[in-house]
């Protein structure tokens, strides 16, 4: 029941309720909610608050779009129990950086967020038209529309 190795979980959990069970049982040291799975910014903030009360850190999982990634970045900047965030924009399709103008690139493990309104992204309509949506399958077998 006890280990010196930190336990992290939560990539595939939905909403604050399963996270609450983990927190109540003191079953993890690090929670990894995913903004696309766990219910968006508001739900991630609630999960973070619940975890903070029990001295559990947050390391958000991120496999969604650049919009989801930057929303998580803004949240991480504002939660005291933030530890680290999964960031793999270098693996995104290169056109994402043209479509989502202002998406931050990491340097030495850090990103600098824009102080522009909203998420700080501008969508380039001309670039979007060059990449019409197509259907793809996600890890859970569901269909996604992506560009």
Feature roles, as predicted:
Residues 119-147:
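Extended hydrophobic packing segments that form well-structured cores
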Residues 1-110, 114-117:
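Shared catalytic-loop signature of beta/alpha-barrel
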């Amino acid at each position: 029941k006890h280990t010196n190795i930190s336990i992290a979980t939560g990539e595939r959990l939905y909403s604050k309720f399963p996270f609450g069970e983990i927190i109540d049982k003191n079953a993890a040291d690090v929670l990894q909610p995913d903004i696309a799975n766990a219910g968006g910014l508001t739900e991630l903030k609630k999960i973070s608050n619940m975890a903070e009360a029990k001295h559990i850190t947050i390391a958000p999982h991120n496999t969604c779009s650049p919009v989801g990634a930057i929303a998580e970045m803004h949240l991480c900047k504002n939660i005291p129990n933030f530890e680290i965030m999964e960031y793999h924009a270098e693996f995104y399709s290169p056109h994402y950086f043209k479509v989502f103008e202002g998406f931050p690139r990491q340097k030495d493990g850090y990103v600098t967020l824009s102080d522009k309104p909203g998420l700080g992204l501008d969508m380039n309509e001309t670039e979007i038209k060059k990449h019409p949506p197509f259907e793809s399958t996600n890890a859970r077998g569901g269909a996604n529309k992506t560009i």
